[in-house]
Amino acid sequence: MSKIINVIGREIMDSRGNPTVEAEVHLEGGFNGMAAAPSGASTGSREALELRDGDKTRYMGKGVLKAVANINGPIRDALMGKDATNQAELDQIMIDLDGTENKDKLGANAILAVSLSAAKAAASFKGLPLYAHIAELNGTAGQYSMPVPMMNILNGGEHADNNVDIQEFMVQPVGAKTFREALQVGAEIFHNLKKVLQEKGLSTSVGDEGGFAPNLASNADALAMIKVAVEKAGYKLGEDVTLALDCAASEFYKDGQYDLTGEGKVFSANGFSDFLKSLTEQYPIASIEDGLDESDWDGWAYQTQIMGDKIQLVGDDLFVTNTKILKRGIDNNIANSILIKFNQIGSLTETLAAIRMAKDAGYTVVISHRSGETEDSTIADLAVATSAGQIKTGSLCRSDRVAKYNQLLRIEEQLGEKAPYRGRSEIKGKA
C-alpha cells in the first residue's frame, strides 16, 4: 500500500514572483503528498544546483520547466513501485540517477520537491503528522521541542533595496514560556518597530522576508531602532529578547576585504570580526550568521576564537547543509552552529544527516527558510521533529512566512508538554 504509483512535477510561483518546482507523490490506496522547493537570494557557491531553464524570453531565464520535465520523466520512472516509507532509498535513487556532486543534472529543486513529497505521502500512509514521520526517519521519535524563532524584522543586503549592509536584523524571544507566547512577543515588537520608523519619517516597506527595509545611516542605527521597539513593546532587551544578525558577508566581500558601502567603511577579515564583536558589546546580540565570507576560513578561525565562547556563530554559506564541509568546520573548530536549508543540499535524507552531525559535535542547529518561499510549511515540522531548537522563517507579515509560524502553533497545540519551548538554553555556543 505504500508503493509509489505516480510522481507529478509542475511549475508554480514563489513569493518573489519567480517560478519554482512543486511535486506530488501518489501511493496505492489514495495516499499522497505535495511539496515545493524554495529559492535563495544570497546563495553559497557550494550549494546544490537549482536548475533553471535559462530561456531569457520566458520569466527572464528563471523558468523551471527542465526541472519539471526531470520529475515527470526520469525521476518518475526510477521511483515507480518503490516504497515511499523508505526515504533513504528514494533519495539515494535520485542522487545516483543524477550522478553529479551538486545535482546539476536533474536539479536540486527537482530532487528536493520529490523527496519532501514522498515524506508527506509516507506520513499520510502511516497516519502520522509529518513531524512524527520525520522524527522516525531521524531516529528521534517522541523527542520533540518547539524552536525559538529567529524573527527577521529589519532587512538589508540582498533582501532589500536600501543602503543597509547587514542582511538581517532579528529578534529572538528567549524569555517566553511557550512558542505561542514567543510569537506574540515578536509580533508586538514588529508592530512597534513600524511605529518607530513612521515617527522618524522612514520607510515601512518590507523586504523579501517581511522585515522593514528603511534607509539608515549605519548598521548600528538598525540595532538602535530595534532596541527602542523592544522597549516600546514592554519587553527587556537581553532578558526577554536577544538580538541576532545575518551578515551574509560573502555579498560584500571584495578582494580580500569587507566593503560596507552603506557605512563607507572597508575592513580586513580580522577587522570586521572586531567590528562585530564591538556591536555585541553594545547590544545583547546572541547570534551572528555568516559573519565572514564562505571561503575565508582563516578569518572564521579568528572570529570563532574571539567570540565562539560567548556568541552563537552560525555557518550558512559557510557550510551549505553539507556534511563534508561541516566536518571540516568541526575538525578545525570553525563556528559553533549550522543553518539548515533543505535546498542547499537537495534531499531530506542528506538534510537529516547534517543535523545529526552538527548535534553530535555540540553545534547548535537553526532550521531556515529561503528568501524565495511558498506556502509550504515543511520546515516547521522539520524543526520540531529533530528538536533543532531554533527556526528562522522571516518576519510577522507575508503569508509565505506566517504559514510556518501557524504550522508551529498547530503542532504545539497537538503536542502540548511533549514539545517544550526551552528559550535561552537553545542559543548557546559550543564552548
UniProtKB/Swiss-Prot annotation:
(2R)-2-phosphoglycerate binds at Q167, K341, R370, S371, K392. SUPFAM superfamilies: Enolase C-terminal domain-like, Enolase N-terminal domain-like. GO terms for biological process: glycolytic process. Keywords: Cytoplasm, Glycolysis, Lyase, Magnesium, Metal-binding, Secreted. Pathway: Carbohydrate degradation; glycolysis; pyruvate from D-glyceraldehyde 3-phosphate: step 4/5. The keyword Ribosomal protein does not apply. Its main location: cytoplasm. It is found in: Cytoplasm; Secreted; Cell surface. The active site is at E209, K341. One of its GO terms (molecular function) is magnesium ion binding. Mg(2+) binds at D246, E289, D316. It holds the Pfam family Enolase_C. The keyword Lyase applies. InterPro entries: Enolase, Enolase-like_C_sf, Enolase-like_N, Enolase_C, Enolase_CS, Enolase_N. Gene3D superfamilies: Enolase-like C-terminal domain, Enolase-like, N-terminal domain. GO terms for cellular component: cell surface; extracellular region; phosphopyruvate hydratase complex. Its EC number is 4.2.1.11. NCBIfam families: eno. Belongs to the enolase family. Catalyzes the reversible conversion of 2-phosphoglycerate (2-PG) into phosphoenolpyruvate (PEP). It is essential for the degradation of carbohydrates via glycolysis. This is Enolase. It comes from Shewanella sediminis (strain HAW-EB3).
